[in-house]
Regions:
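Generic detector of short, locally flexible boundary/turn motifs and exposed helical patches
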Residues: 34-39, 74-77, 100
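Long, positively charged, glycine-interspersed low-complexity recognition regions
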Residues: 82-148
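Active-site segments of SGNH/GDSL-like serine hydrolases
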Residues: 62-87
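Secreted/periplasmic serine-hydrolase-like ester/acetyl group-modifying domain
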Residues: 1-66
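A structural motif corresponding to the C-terminal end of an alpha-helix
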Residues: 55-70, 101-109
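Generic alpha-helix detector with strongest preference for long hydrophobic helices that associate
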Residues: 4-11, 15, 37-40, 44, ...
Length: 148
């Protein structure tokens, strides 16, 4: 589609100083000169247990009590960056599954974008949606709105 073509052209222009497809400014400010130190820094990182899961449960419980029907957007991590920092795919999968399970427990409708970890230009930095990511989000929001 034309939107995707435009998104890719803009992304290429804005990510020209690094091999991770991240915004030039972000990469320069937060990673560039520290790149080598980032390699394998997350080798022991795990989200098997995290207090943030309880925070998510509280949010979903409030939604249930107030009869709010949210669309929970489950954003992926940046796959290539996570690999570089040593946050292994199996541990990311465990994290994704934990979040999915919590959403299912509360009957929360979810836009699961976690399958796009390696999609070029889906993320604009290590954790935020990028050009293709926002297109996927926009399409889902439109569908969600008209489906209510």
């Amino acid at each position: 589609a034309a939107e995707e073509q435009t998104a890719v052209l803009e992304a290429k222009r804005m990510t020209s100083n690094n091999d991770f497809g991240m915004l030039n400014d972000y990469y320069t400010t937060y990673i560039g000169s520290r790149l080598e130190r980032q390699q394998n820094r997350d080798a022991s990182l795990s989200y098997s247990v995290s207090k943030e899961y309880d925070d998510l449960r509280i949010l979903f419980e409030i939604c249930r009590q107030k009869e709010i029907e949210p669309l929970f957007v489950h954003v992926p991590l940046h796959g290539r960056w996570s690999d570089y920092t040593g946050f292994a795919a199996d541990r990311r999968a465990e994290y994704y599954e934990n979040v999915r399970r919590i959403a299912e427990e509360y009957g929360i409708r979810t836009l699961d974008l976690t399958g796009y970890e390696y999609e070029e230009y889906f993320m604009c930095d290590t954790m935020h949606l990028g050009w293709k990511g926002w297109l996927a989000f926009d399409r889902a929001i439109i569908d969600y709105y008209y489906d209510l």
